[in-house]
Amino acid sequence: MTGHTGDVSQVHDIEILALNPTVNKHATFKPTIVSKKDKENWARLDHCKKGCELKNDFEDVKPTTLTERGALFESARCLKCADAPCQKGCPTQLDIKSFISSISTKNYYGAAKTIFSDNPLGLTCGMVCPVSSLCQYGCNLAATEEGPINIGGLQQFATEVFKKMNIPQIRDPSLTPLSQLPESYKAKIALIGCGPTSISCATFLGRLGYTDVTIFEKEQYLGGLSSSEIPNYRLNYEVVEFEIKLMKDLGVKVEYGKRLGENGFTVESLQKQGYEAIYLGIGMPEPKIDPVFNELTSDQGFFSSKEFLPKVSKASKAGMCGCKSQLPQLNGRVIVLGAGDTAFDCATSAFRCGASRVTVCFRRGFSDMRAVPEEVDIAKDERCEFLPYVLPKQVIKRDGKVVAMEFYKTEKGDDGNYSVDEDQFFRVKCDYIISAFGSQIGSVAESCSPLQFNKWGTADIDPMTMTSKHAEWLFCGGDLVGNGTTVEAVNDGKTASWNIHKYLQSLHGIPIPDGPPQLPNFFTPIDLVDISVEMCGMKFPNPFGLASATPATSAAMIRRSFEQGWGFAVTKTFSLDKDLVTNVSPRIVRGTTSGHHFGPGQGAFLNIELISEKTCHYWCKAIGELKRDFPDRIVIASIMCGFNKEDWTQLAKMAEASGADGIELNLSCPHGMGEKGMGLACGQDTELVFHICQWVRAATRLPFFAKLTPNVTEIKEIAKAAHDGGADGVTAINTVSGLMGLKGDSNAWPAIGDEKRTTYGGVSGNATRPIALRAVSSIRKSLPDYPIMATGGADSADATIQFLHCGASVVQICSSVQNQDFTVVQDYITGLKTYLYMQSREDLLQWDGQSPPNEIINKNPKLKGLPKFGKYLLERNRIDTEEKQNIDLQKVKNPLVPSPNPTHPVPSLKDQINRAIPRIGRHDDLKRDQQVVALIDEDKCINCGKCYMTCNDSGYQAIKFDGKTHIPLVTDLCTGCDLCLSVCPVPDCITMVPRETIYVPDRGLTVQN
């Protein structure tokens, strides 16, 4: 082969390197007039579609909507606070920090389960909740520069992923079976109106076990205002169908075309038919119309929001109705009256119906608008105009059509009240008027009898129980009682369900004790999966246990961990009284492996903490108490002493007498104890390990495990010594010896005492996981079927599965508890169950864990070569707007299908152990004739050039970077090293695909024989 000629160090790729960063050796300038023009070439922020460009465009426009990348980034930012204020701000009391914690570990089912447990319309609320005035309102991160968490976006993301899984809801089988419930659970229950509040109420009643629950809906579609009045670009009908399907999974029935006041259908008629409890969730069905608009019709150019928004929804929400409705054609100038959320839905919908200009007019000032910022910001971005301090005076018509609107000016007094100045009025030209001045019960009030209404026109109820003050069997919620947001309506239904339950049981002589409500959680077949595992005769209810570390500092802490669901615990290492220790402080510090990252989710910790300061007698007593109170949990005693047969024998016998299930020999503490001839001092020598294991084997019949140090050349040799000495298994690994960092004055942290001295400590956490995975797999390959307890960065179900695949049976956990609290185990449990369940469904086998496969999208060839910035983005928008004019808005993209049954048995945890081992081996066994190259998805690329830079300065100069479009192009020089993919900030933007040509390495110079 012929290599380079001339100097081999000469730079040859001048063209490719043209845009590669170089060090500036002097300041530069560009005239302002030039830079002003240039910046437009790269603009992204102000180039979204707006105004008339939005005609027929009902795609999601919410700025809160997240991709998986965004969700993982945002969830990692969450502090997961104690007594979290976000939960207090949520009407449904969602455990927000828990579901966000699950998202951060890629356990999207766990997140969805948490959400749907408290909010059966969790996806709807994730999409439309005014979080800025609810959960986000109290976010502690609002006190920082980066601002509050995007809670709504995270909720939407997790529940949408669960929707794609297509898994049915079932009733928790741990509850009393339906066949064994008393007759009171067969009571007939009616709900009127199939909107959010009724769906919520019916779902909880179904979970409680009521089997005769019927919803009566006036329309031929379901969902109430979620379907008819919230636009598709905020909430599509697929979401409504999905949540109703989950409700129907519990046996709830729905009857269509049942309109109050028609054909004798009333609240009282239902009671006469034997319905023992009735829930009214009909909203406020009629608009409030200003007398100025009396006798005006849509043909003349006037709409109420109650008329306009349903017309838009029927024409734009695929699957909502079978009719072939057309969008209202508002070709001209539109005035929207009102300043609530509904008014802004009307305003942004008007653009999609062809409006050339939309003006939102309202009586108050900007600071007193009722609409939430989420709605106002979208309208502002889409170029709606705003006209505050005005009140309708009269409509101007010409030839029977609206042509203008006259307004009075209003003023705000010092007392905060608004007044009308009739001396000031003006005219605004328009072609259409949409009134969004609120709604009222109207003519159906009589059909709601015996329900009565208060002076505000809302139902007269007890707001603590949602019970009518005039009929104990009648309950109400949602708009009807003045709670106008979707999430408040959902919570009304939830509250009513419990009180309906209490009422019905009392009717049948079964009083429900006072105390906190106990509504059943969301439950699916995933939750039935068995994740128990047996190792060395010990039956672990789940593979998650506390490592012998800070979370096991005391018996009371282990007790609390068991109460939260942990399967086992290893005690903090204890010694004989003659070897008692006293710790220094400070002794546990955050890692530096994740850069300057503060707060949650630390990638590593370093500690110089010694073994337990408590006596061996304390721990032996504690073990007995824990086994007495938690007989199904595994308790393993961790012991340590020097190389002394009598001491090891005594400690082993004490541990056995305490009632422990097993013993762990701490032969690996990397700091402090080694200086005393213990821990690391014993565990680095195969001969010492062999003899210690022999002594312990002779002293006890309990299974015992040697805890191994990674601070050796080859850990499998230490494992072999333990095996040969009689140990039943090993724990791999203990912490890695390290020095975490130095300050600018050369002092390390932790620095002890006035002299600021330090020592090498043990590094733990995710930073050690690659070392731990290597250790576990190496031991497994060397000692097939030898029991292994893994530890070292097991911070999720996802990480746990990796350890199982490498040969471990259970995992010990410390750092993730230090990062959060004991409740994280529930995230790991649901995550592991989900992983196993998904392997039983053929349609889910292509998922990467809980990450859905990339959707196959037919890419528009017209968009090729057009990045999403500057003039190229404007051109993309033009093409998209043009093609939207002919789009079939009623074509269902993702039709709802029945949940498939498993096609294979759900595998056991044991089936996962060792799965990766056959594919881990020698470098010489790797195929050199099966090469790959990088493929960049232009549509996903954000044009950052990270791939280009790393390939230039750390790779093979194989990527070109267009100076105008910033689109990267992989050339034939690509060697498939994968570095570009590793630094790419967008998941799946770069993939490695088979190389189509034979790979010929560049040897630099001609190969010499």
Curated annotation (Swiss-Prot):
For this record, the Gene Ontology CC terms, alphabetical, are: cytoplasm; cytosol
Q: Where does NADP(+) bind?
A: 339-342, 363-364, 370, 436-438, 479-484
Q: Which reaction does it catalyse?
A: 5,6-dihydrouracil + NADP(+) = uracil + NADPH + H(+)
Highest taxon, organism lineage: Eukaryota
Name the residues annotated as catalytic in the UniProt entry. Answer: C669
Gene3D superfamilies noted in UniProt: 3.30.70.20, Aldolase class I, Alpha-helical ferredoxin, FAD/NAD(P)-binding domain
Q: Which residues bind [4Fe-4S] cluster 3?
A: C941, C944, C947, C951
Q: Which GO terms describe its molecular function?
A: 4 iron, 4 sulfur cluster binding; dihydropyrimidine dehydrogenase (NADP+) activity; metal ion binding; NADP binding; uracil binding
Tell me its cofactors: [4Fe-4S] cluster; FAD; FMN
Q: Which UniProt keywords apply?
A: 4Fe-4S, Cytoplasm, FAD, Flavoprotein, FMN, Iron, Iron-sulfur, Metal-binding, NADP, Nucleotide-binding, Oxidoreductase, Repeat
* EC annotation from Swiss-Prot or TrEMBL: 1.3.1.2
Q: How is the cofactor bound?
A: Binds 4 [4Fe-4S] clusters. Contains approximately 16 iron atoms per subunit.
Q: Where does [4Fe-4S] cluster 1 bind?
A: C78, C81, C86, C139
| Statement: the UniProt record of this protein carries the keyword Metal-binding | yes
Q: In which pathway does it act?
A: Amino-acid biosynthesis; beta-alanine biosynthesis
Any GO BP: thymidine catabolic process
Q: Binding of FMN: at which residues? A: S548, K572, T573, K707, G765, T791, G792, G793, C814, S815
TM stretches of this protein: none
Q: Which residues bind FAD?
A: 128, 193-197, 217-225, 234, 260, 478-486
Which residues are listed for [4Fe-4S] cluster 4 binding in this entry? C974, C977, C980, C984
| UniProt-annotated location(s) | Cytoplasm
Q: Which residues form the 4Fe-4S ferredoxin-type domain?
A: 69-99, 932-964, 965-995
Q: What family is reported? A: Belongs to the dihydropyrimidine dehydrogenase family.
Q: What does this protein do?
A: Involved in pyrimidine base degradation. Catalyzes the reduction of uracil and thymine.
Relate the assembly described in the record: Homodimer.
Protein name, per record: Dihydropyrimidine dehydrogenase [NADP(+)]
Q: Which organism is it from?
A: Dictyostelium discoideum
